[in-house]
Amino acid sequence: MSKVTVVGAGAVGATCANVMACREVASEVVLIDIKEGLSEGKMLDMYQCSTLMDFDTKVVGATNDYKMTANSDVVVITSGIPRKPGMTREELIGTNAGIMKGVIENVIKYSPRAIIIVVANPMDTLTYLALKASGLPKNRIIGMGGALDSSRFKCYLAKATGANINNVDGMVIGGHGDTTMIPL
């Protein structure tokens, strides 16, 4: 039995929860959000599609009830305000750092043994903040930027060259920021 919690029911968080449930990555997937009823509605949709998609993952939605996340093996944090057009990731630090601190406090309270994956922006800074705020060892806090950046890079390459996306290989190294990514 394994349990994964996704914090943040926006586009990234809901998609993440959906993919994990459909692929049966865990026996239980919990989606939690601050917005009343949002995660419950998304998980109800997911549950009702389970017969069509042929998966048996337990799916749970919760509004700010971190007790529902207790004993999670993995917690994926996608919560935070998104960038607006023309905004840099770094401009999100003030608001999203406060959100991250509150989330980490609840994650540690209810799932002190969890591995934490940070997907919120600015990802590098918030991953470091999660490490410091959690007190967990560094091998239990993961920033997800590199995989996402590499995937985006391969998509752009395929589109630019007209190649089949499954035949394109490439990766991005460096920080998940506007000036620190290096495509290879």
Positions of PLM-derived features:
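Glycine-rich Rossmann-fold phosphate-binding loop(s) that bind the pyrophosphate
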Residues: A9-G10
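N-terminal Rossmann-fold NAD(P) dinucleotide-binding loop
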Residues: G13-A14
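Conserved N-terminal Rossmann-fold NAD(P) cofactor-binding segment
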Residues: I34-N71
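N-terminal Rossmann-like NAD(P) cofactor-binding module of classical short-chain dehydrogenase/reductase
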Residues: D73-V76
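Conserved NAD(P)H cofactor-binding loop of Rossmann-fold oxidoreductase domains
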Residues: S79-I81
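Rossmann-like NAD(P)(H) cofactor-binding subdomain of soluble oxidoreductases
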Residues: T88-K154
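Substrate/ligand-engaging "lid" and interaction regions
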Residues: K154-L184
